[in-house]
Amino acid sequence: MLDTRYALGTQHVLTNSRGRIAGKFEVDGVLTDASGNVTVTVVDTDGTMLVDSQTATQDSTGIYYYDLGTAHTTRVRKVTVTWSGTWESTSQSAVLEYEVVGNFIFTESQARTFDDQALSSTSSYTDEAIADERARITDLLFDWTSLSWIPRFYKAKLKGEYSPELLLPHRLVNNLISVTIDGVSIATSKFELDSEVGVLYYKEGYFTQPTQTYPLNIVVEYEHGYKSVVDGVDRIGLKMLRMRLPVSNIPENTRSFTDSLGTADFIVEGQGPFGIFNRTRSPEVNAWLEQHSASIIGW
């Protein structure tokens, strides 16, 4: 059975980069080469074919990559990639979704030099491992604060209410990519955007109500999120990385630990005293999350 996963830390790729995407292919848990070429087909969220059955390059056993090229990384976007090849004498395909983002919350170099430099070893902690964990942390911070801390793509499918105003699902909307109403593409110049609160104004018409043909009749593609690293999110991300990657002999649900130096108390993730919910075991990270989550309550 073929199992396909992200490889080389390419789940997130930067805008204006070569756009390298990679996949690792395992048969029964073992990295396995394809018999012959592996091809790549890349489709944008609107169905546009960006890459059609091009040959991927082999990096190492069972790992293949393809460079999208700068033409396809000029803006944030999500792409669906189909990897196709022959394994176990059978033609097989696997689909992964990759994201072009406008920034990273921290770099591999920062990760290796942070704090006590616990991640300095490139053999113990590869760039791939750091990049994969960074992508997970980026998603966690978005889930926990309802704000994106890097520029990201989103495609919203909404119902119009016959109003010139439309509330988008996110704050900090940087720019519009496309707007479609009842299946008709409308020039983005016809709209005004309140970036801070995520409200879109139609200057020359109304966002019509849905129909049976178009039940979600308003489709808006946009970039949202902070354009640069702000409010110390890089430090928060690095502290989370420091807690998540290095192996510890202390079980994660340990509440206290006693040795010759005395007893140390630990914060446990989950419900704490006085109704406090701890997202992590770090007081600093938890305080930062509480501050930045509270800032959007009531919005």
Listing of model-derived features with the role each one plays in the protein:
Residues 55-58:
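Short beta-strand segments within Ig-like beta-sandwich modules, predominantly Fibronectin type-III
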Residues 2-20, 26-51, 61-299:
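Divalent metal-cofactor coordination and adjacent catalytic microenvironments
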